[in-house]
Amino acid sequence: MSYDDHAVLEAILRCAGGDERFLLNTVEEWGAAEITAALVDELLFRCEIPQVGGEAFIGLDVLHGADRISHVLQVTDGKPVTSAEPAGQELGGRTWSSRSATLLRELFGPPSGRTAGGFGVSFLPDLRGPRTMEGAALAARATNVVLHATTNETPPLDRLALRYESDKWGGVHWFTGHYDRHLRAVRDQAVRILEIGIGGYDDLLPSGASLKMWKRYFPRGLVFGVDIFDSRRATSRVSRRSAARQDDPEFMRRVAEEHGPFDVIIDDGSHINAHMRTSFSVMFPHLRNGGFYVIEDTFTSYWPGYGGPSGARCPSGTTALEMVKGLIDSVHYEERPDGAATADYIARNLVGLHAYQTTSSSSRRAINKEGGIPHTVPREPFWNDN
């Protein structure tokens, strides 16, 4: 099944927080097998690397009405959990069963504690003898790896960065604390994330590390990525667009029209100052109200090779940091004498920004029209210093 257009996942996310009838109708519309394939794909992605001391094959039965859709999951110590062919496999002592609606809600619904009776476990007959106790313990550990992946517990962002080998933490950059501070409030919402810059360059296999990180951090999110290098491969809830420059306004507008509006836009692209400025001016209007626009690596404003000044101490007027400085004036446009006449879209829709040392700056979109400070407040000091 292809997830390039996110149609199945978008349908799942729409119904996961709805009533039971809407959810079941969605499963019927798409087909239980199609929905189950997407759920199993997500389940495998969320499984932690097992530390189980061996290998076990766990059966998974997803029930929908009279239908029973069976999968086998291979849980091997130190390796990612994968799907396995049922034929010829000895299940590791148990089969786990869940209703399609229950599994869908646990993976993609709003946060909630697991209730009793959410799943069933059946033991195989060959576990009744004393010789199989070690196998039973292995099966229990393997089953726990899979069951834990359905909970609402998400690892901290720094751990996710290390797991998926993103450079946002632990090496050159230390961004995850800043991201978590601003984004944790929407972590469990059905958000849409766009990241400019996928990574991997001409070696496509390791690309998309931060996209996977965001996919795991936002369990109900859809993640999109664009890059100048061809990275078209997609996985569930992650879509990648192929070679295009971020300073191509028409291309970026097409991305926004096709996949937006976005809750978060992250510019981790070329880091060339002109590109960052172009992307911001084009893409900021495609943030939803309350969304965040993040520009990483603004320290290139000091590097001539990226469009920074040559031989000067401060960034020139054409750098990303100078643009950020100008945004402070934009936030306060209502206090300027010419504010109402000169305010552009960004000024009228930017309510705040944060800047961090050599790392990133984030801007929040919302309606910026509080009326300004009343004219009854004097514009000169009311005390006399003379």
From Swiss-Prot:
Reaction equation(s) it catalyzes: L-olivosyl-oleandolide + S-adenosyl-L-methionine = L-oleandrosyl-oleandolide + S-adenosyl-L-homocysteine + H(+)
Keywords: Antibiotic biosynthesis, Magnesium, Metal-binding, Methyltransferase, S-adenosyl-L-methionine, Transferase
One Pfam entry name: MycE_N
Variation of activity with pH: Optimum pH is 7.2-7.6.
Active site: H271 (proton acceptor)
UniProt-listed Enzyme Commission number(s): 2.1.1.239
InterPro entries: MycE_N, SAM-dependent_MTases_sf
Cofactor(s) it depends on: Mg(2+)
Domain of life: Bacteria
Pathway(s) per entry: Antibiotic biosynthesis
A single MF term (Gene Ontology): S-adenosylmethionine-dependent methyltransferase activity
GO biological process: one example: antibiotic biosynthetic process
Name of the top EC class for this enzyme: transferase
Residues that hold Mg(2+) according to the record: D268, E296, D297
Region span, Disordered: 364-386
Binding site for S-adenosyl-L-methionine: S166, E195, I196, G197, I198, G199, G200, Y201, S210, D227, R245, Q246, D268
Family: Belongs to the methyltransferase OleY/MycE family.
Function, as annotated: 3-O-methyltransferase involved in the synthesis of L-oleandrose, a sugar attached to oleandomycin, a macrolide antibiotic. Acts on monoglycosylated macrolactones and mediates the conversion of L-olivosyl-erythronolide B into its 3-O-methylated derivative, L-oleandrosyl-erythronolide B. Also able to methylate other monoglycosylated derivatives, such as L-rhamnosyl- and L-mycarosyl-erythronolide B.
Subunit composition and interactions: Homodimer.
Record protein name field: L-olivosyl-oleandolide 3-O-methyltransferase
Species the sequence originates in: Streptomyces antibioticus
